[in-house]
Amino acid sequence: MWQLLLPTALLLLVSAGMRAEDLPKAVVFLEPQWYRVLEKDSVTLKCQGAYSPEDNSTRWFHNESLISSQTSSYFIAAARVNNSGEYRCQTSLSTLSDPVQLEVHIGWLLLQAPRWVFKEEESIHLRCHSWKNTLLHKVTYLQNGKGRKYFHQNSDFYIPKATLKDSGSYFCRGLIGSKNVSSETVNITITQDLAVSSISSFFPPGYQVSFCLVMVLLFAVDTGLYFSVKKSVPSSTRDWEDHKFKWSKDPQDK
């Protein structure tokens, strides 16, 4: 870890008695948010991290090789396939960031999303991106080979709340001029909440309904017993008081 620190930061750490493990980790952001892009697209990678007053430089790594750029933003004006790979950054008062993957593809269309794994009820944002933003019309988003959404003019496709049924293979197609073009297929996975999943796996579908009915029945019986006991309590109390009164009138107590 020490060899990854900038020289000035290393001196500051030694003088302050700090350890490299005490430093926060830098974070890399993509702008725009898509990590899959087409050739000729512009991409900006931004590094978020702490800087010392003496050193505001940033170190960038592409596939573990140091990049000459030392600014907080690394700009790729026209992406090429060899720009694909892992990017990391580090500032003078931060440790090396986790890697961010960039994929540069060749083709007319590319289906884009911030990621491909979502939780139930999360929103999904899909974009049918054309090479050099060429005009695209009559766009269809397809799931498992079936049309899911159609737009006369190219538009992004939103799924407000994902369900398990939204899992599957997706691609988009449309017209560039009179040319029919399609994107590659990608897989989207919707994961289930662990608590719901554990209940569903414990009780097979046919037994889940029976389980609910049993729970309702037990609740009804329990409620009936509660009111029955509550109703009998005053009567028992009166009997006890009558018994106590008769006992106090015993001739031996006079």
From Swiss-Prot:
Compartment list: Cell membrane; Secreted
Membrane-side (Cytoplasmic) residue stretches: 230-254
Protein name in the entry: Low affinity immunoglobulin gamma Fc region receptor III-A
A GO biological-process term: calcium-mediated signaling
Protein's membrane topology: Single-pass type I membrane protein
Signal peptide (UniProt feature, chain positions): 1-20
A Pfam family per the record: Ig_2
SMART domains assigned to the protein according to its UniProt record, in alphabetical order: IG
PTM field: Glycosylated. Glycosylation plays an inhibitory role in the interaction with IgG1 and IgG2.
GO molecular function list: IgG binding; IgG receptor activity
PANTHER family in UniProt: IMMUNOGLOBULIN FC RECEPTOR, LOW AFFINITY IMMUNOGLOBULIN GAMMA FC REGION RECEPTOR III-A-RELATED
Main localization category: membrane
Alphabetical keyword list: Cell membrane, Disulfide bond, Glycoprotein, IgG-binding protein, Immunity, Immunoglobulin domain, Membrane, Receptor, Repeat, Secreted, Signal, Transmembrane, Transmembrane helix
Organism for this UniProt entry: Macaca mulatta (Rhesus macaque)
Disulfide bonds: 47-89, 128-172
CC annotations in GO: external side of plasma membrane; extracellular space; plasma membrane
Site feature Important for receptor turnover, where: 222
Listed transmembrane segments: 207-229
Expression (tissue specificity): Lymphocytes and monocytes.
Residue ranges constituting the Ig-like C2-type domain according to the UniProt record: 24-105, 107-189
Residues that carry a glycan: 187
Extracellular side: 21-206
Source organism superkingdom: Eukaryota
Residues at the site labelled Cleavage: 195-196
Self-association state and partner proteins as the record states: Forms a heterooligomeric complex with ITAM-containing signaling subunits, either a homodimer of CD247, a homodimer of FCER1G or a heterodimer of CD247 and FCER1G, to form a functional receptor complex. Interacts (via transmembrane domain) with signaling subunits; this interaction is a prerequisite for receptor complex expression on the cell surface and intracellular signal transduction. Binds the Fc region of antigen-complexed IgG with a preference for IgG1 and IgG3 isotypes. Interacts with CD2; this interaction is involved in NK cell activation and cytotoxicity.
Job of this protein: Receptor for the invariable Fc fragment of immunoglobulin gamma (IgG). Optimally activated upon binding of clustered antigen-IgG complexes displayed on cell surfaces, triggers lysis of antibody-coated cells, a process known as antibody-dependent cellular cytotoxicity (ADCC). Does not bind free monomeric IgG, thus avoiding inappropriate effector cell activation in the absence of antigenic trigger. Mediates IgG effector functions on natural killer (NK) cells.
